[in-house]
Every structure is written in structure tokens, then in C-alpha cells.
């Protein structure tokens, strides 16, 4: 597993040196497949796929949630915002970076920046290609991030119905990857969690039935 080499050309050097498979722990370029566990792992073909991407942490959080909605309803479009803890790509003090906003001190500001997580959904749920977009807000917390997903659905729904679908999935096919809570928790309560994401049922809202 590598997070250093994010493209097939560089990651494949591991194959030349004896590795049988290479997993990129980030979005990958020109890889054989992008896999999010619980969503599309059945698309993995060990006979033909040697360099794989496990996508980003945000995509792994977002994709199971989107899968539940997409399996039960028709998504017309969607927008996500990830409120993301700072990472080692950022600077502790104002410094140099190709992204001027990420050049600012990560513990001192809320930093708007880009994320490819929403677009990556199309790689693991192909029918949603081009239907989701998003942005990131890097915030001064060291761990645990949040994804705020807003979708426009074809069907008329209620928050209770949506939550029931999430709860059922978290207790069934997505039990290893998606959790569900109705408790008034905050980010620090999720330190050490083993799942890809937790649905905060208290924050589920529906406007005009869609």
C-alpha cells in the first residue's frame, strides 16, 4: 500500500520489485480500478487489476451514504461539503504552497479548498457520473471530518424514511462500513471508529419533500 505514488506509472514500480498488487491509499491516476469497500468491491478482477486506488477518506465516507440513497431513490443532482480536519499537506504557519489558501496556517483559519471526493463517486457508482460536485473546508481540528451531503431527489420523501433506510443498511449489508446514530455526538466522539462513516440522524433534513 502506498500514499506516496498516486499514479500507475510510479506505483507499478512496486510490481517490478516483487509486489503482486499495489493499493494507492488516495485517489489514483490511470489505475486499474478505484474501489470503496461496501460499495463496489465486487468490481475487482484479480486476474486483470494490479494497481488499485482506495480513493480518499472523504470518498470512503461519502460513497456508502450515496449508495444507500441511490439504491432506494433517484438522485437528480447533489452537492457535498466536507468539513475536514487539517492534514500534513497544509502549513502550520503561513508559508508557500501551490494552493494559496492551503499555504495559510492550518490551526488558525477555516480554509476553503477543493476536493475530488464528489466527482470520484462516478468511479465507484458509474450511473452518478457528473451528478455530484463539492468543496472542502479545512478546519483547525486534528482528527475526524464531516461530510454534509445535499441531494435533489426525483421522489417525495421524509427525513424519517431516509433515516430508516440508513439504519437498515448500517445493520445489514453495510454493517462493516456504515454506522448510524441518533445520539447528540460531536467530532471527538468518533476518534478511533472503525467504519468509513457514521450517519448523524439528528441532522437529516428534507425540504419540499425532495
Task: Label the model's feature ranges.
Residues 1-103, 205-209:
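N-terminal Rossmann-like NAD(P) cofactor-binding subdomain of oxidoreductases
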Residues 74-77, 82-209:
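C-terminal substrate-binding/catalytic lobe of Rossmann-fold NAD(P)-dependent oxidoreductases
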Amino acid at each position: 500500500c502506498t500514499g506516496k505514488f498516486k499514479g500507475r506509472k510510479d506505483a507499478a514500480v512496486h510490481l517490478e520489485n516483487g509486489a503482486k498488487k499495489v493499493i494507492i491509499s488516495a485517489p489514483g491516476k490511470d489505475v486499474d480500478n478505484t474501489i470503496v469497500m461496501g460499495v463496489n468491491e465486487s468490481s475487482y478482477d484479480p486476474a486483470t487489476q494490479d494497481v488499485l486506488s482506495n480513493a480518499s477518506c472523504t470518498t470512503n465516507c461519502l460513497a456508502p451514504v450515496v449508495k444507500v440513497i441511490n439504491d432506494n431513490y433517484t438522485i437528480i443532482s447533489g452537492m457535498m461539503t466536507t468539513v475536514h480536519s487539517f492534514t500534513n499537506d497544509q502549513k502550520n504557519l503561513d508559508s508557500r504552497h501551490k494552493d494559496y489558501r492551503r499555504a495559510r496556517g492550518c490551526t488558525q483559519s477555516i480554509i476553503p479548498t477543493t476536493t475530488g471526493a464528489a466527482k470520484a463517486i462516478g468511479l465507484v457508482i458509474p450511473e452518478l457520473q457528473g451528478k455530484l460536485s463539492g468543496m472542502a473546508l479545512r478546519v483547525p481540528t486534528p482528527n475526524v471530518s464531516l461530510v454534509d451531503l445535499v441531494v435533489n431527489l426525483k421522489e417525495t420523501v421524509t427525513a424519517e424514511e431516509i433515516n430508516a433506510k440508513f439504519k437498515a443498511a448500517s445493520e445489514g449489508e453495510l454493517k462493516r462500513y456504515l454506522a448510524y446514530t441518533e445520539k447528540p455526538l460531536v467530532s471527538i466522539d468518533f476518534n478511533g471508529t472503525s467504519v468509513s462513516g457514521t450517519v448523524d440522524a439528528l441532522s437529516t433534513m428534507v425540504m419540499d419533500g425532495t
